[in-house]
């Protein structure tokens, strides 16, 4: 299971209801003009730079860190700032691998780590064999994250790393996130959320740093493609992963979900023209 965000199926209406957020001059991303009192691009960019400076100070204050690393936008940015601030000897990014973690996302995580020299450790997680997780209840993510942080916290302690951190950001705080409880129980920190980083700010600072994940679509775990109450099995997750990979091979970009409904699949895409 990746350490980045994990969600159950989210209706399109809920996605459409998200309020517009000022874009920070990101390439190929349009700014919303839904609000009359938007901060100027220069002001918004300066605010993001100031937050990054405070993030570096946060890492310095702790001295060392283990990052739960999925290869998504948030954890990739977090790992790169930690590395720049603390150095390789005091930074470790850990990838939790299981059937719910797409191979394509693992490849992106390794690409970022290799490009920037982030020390990486991979561990296998065993949530698939937990009947509470496999039953796919509405708090499924709690059992996944309990397994993940239960494996990462001892690694941090054994290596003398002061804190374990995840990539939760300020925009995540209003979401349904049962995994956040598991993180709190294990003493996991969320510095991006603590410092008020929005997703757009993280994308902007990632672009400025040349981190290739800056415009990457969100990628919840594969189990989120199954309706709550539908048992999570390795076979079902593999079918979803293969279907999404086949669609990507056709040139589909942006957000993509293949929702599993037994003999039926529903495909969710970003709106826009198709070729």
Which residues are covered by each model-predicted region?
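AMP-forming adenylation/ATP pyrophosphatase catalytic core
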Residues: 35, 147, 177-275
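ATP-dependent adenylation/nucleotidyltransferase module used to activate substrates
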Residues: 33-208, 249, 265
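Compositionally biased, low-complexity flexible segments
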Residues: 1-29
């Amino acid at each position: 299971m990746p350490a980045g965000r994990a969600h159950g199926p989210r209706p399109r209406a809920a996605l459409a209801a998200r309020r517009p957020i000022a874009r920070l001059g990101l390439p190929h991303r349009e700014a919303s003009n839904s609000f009359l009192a938007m901060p100027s691009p220069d002001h918004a960019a300066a605010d993001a730079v100031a937050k990054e400076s405070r993030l570096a100070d946060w890492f310095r204050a702790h001295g060392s860190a283990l990052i739960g690393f999925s290869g998504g936008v948030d954890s990739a940015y977090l790992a790169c700032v930690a590395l720049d601030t603390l150095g390789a000897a005091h930074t470790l990014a850990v990838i939790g691998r299981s059937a719910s973690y797409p191979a394509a996302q693992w490849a992106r995580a390794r690409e970022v780590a290799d490009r920037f020299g982030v020390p990486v450790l991979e561990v296998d997680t065993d949530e698939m064999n937990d009947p509470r997780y496999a039953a796919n209840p509405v708090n499924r993510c709690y059992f996944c994250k309990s397994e993940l942080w239960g494996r990462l916290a001892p690694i941090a302690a054994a290596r003398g790393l002061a804190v374990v951190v995840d990539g939760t950001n300020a925009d995540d705080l209003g979401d349904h996130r049962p995994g956040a409880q598991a993180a709190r129980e294990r003493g996991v920190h969320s510095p991006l959320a603590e410092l008020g980083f929005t997703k757009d700010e993280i994308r902007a600072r990632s672009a400025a740093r040349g981190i290739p994940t800056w415009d990457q679509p969100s990628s919840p775990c594969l189990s989120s493609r199954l309706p709550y109450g539908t048992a999570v099995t390795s076979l079902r997750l593999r079918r979803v992963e293969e279907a999404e990979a086949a669609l990507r091979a056709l040139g589909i970009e942006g957000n993509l979900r293949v929702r599993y409904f037994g003999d039926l699949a529903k495909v969710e895409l970003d709106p826009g023209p198709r070729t």
